[in-house]
Design a protein with these regions (language model features):
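Extreme N-terminus of proteins, especially the signal/transit-peptide cleavage junction
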Residues: 1-8, 141
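Charge-dense, low-complexity intrinsically disordered segments
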Residues: 4, 28, 165-169
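A solvent-exposed interaction/effector surface
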Residues: 63, 70, 89, 93-171
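Terminal helix-turn-helix DNA-binding modules in bacterial transcription factors
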Residues: 7, 11-27, 47-82, 109-131
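Residue-identity detector for glutamine
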Residues: 3, 11-14, 38, 98, ...
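Basic/polar phosphate-binding segments, predominantly the helix-turn-helix DNA-binding elements
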Residues: 1-2, 24-57, 80-102
Length: 171
């Protein structure tokens, strides 16, 4: 299987997840979107994204739920059911495990948390192919210290030689 075929298949799965984020998604649905078997779809998804499809889906749903809790005055139970969690207890456990703060406390006092914001896999590989690097990649940096020293302006004394046949006659 060619690399770009894998990338396009994972991109189709990402698009399907983004389109159906608020409805139940099965591995069978993702496999149909990718056009491969369930096993192969899950394998290439993990290979290219570093997460299984359901780890990816859960992290994405929790991050979108955190944004909704932060930006609106929605109840925790409503947000939990909107993002396809079976109960608010399960949602609270998952939210607390992911972000280290309960959703109720986060909605009352939103502190900065690390949200899962995945990039489109196709765009990522296109930029990698072009040779562009991410700002998060560390490059070898060299530090240069500069010290400004102010000195008085110099004056020039120029004395031209009257008779000289070579350079050393001037000395």
């Amino acid at each position: 299987m060619e690399r770009w075929e894998k990338i396009n298949a994972v991109q189709r799965m990402q698009d399907y997840i983004n389109k159906h984020i608020n409805s139940p998604i099965t591995l069978s649905d993702l496999a149909k979107a990718a056009g491969y078997s369930q096993y192969h779809s899950a394998r290439i998804f993990r290979e290219l994204t570093g997460k299984s499809p359901f780890e990816y889906l859960r992290a994405l749903r929790l991050s979108k739920a955190a944004l909704r809790l932060r930006d609106s005055r929605a109840k925790v139970i409503d947000v939990a059911f909107d993002f396809v969690f079976d109960s608010h207890e399960g949602f609270t456990r998952a939210f607390t495990k992911q972000f280290g703060i309960p959703p109720k406390k986060y909605s009352e006092d939103p502190k900065p948390i690390k949200l899962f914001m995945p990039s489109r896999i196709r765009d990522y590989y296109l930029t990698m192919q072009k040779g562009e690097t991410d700002m998060s990649e560390k490059k070898d940096t060299k530090t240069v210290f500069v010290q400004v020293v102010e000195r008085p302006a110099r004056k020039l004394i120029l004395k031209r030689g009257i008779k000289a046949d070579n350079y050393f006659d001037y000395c």
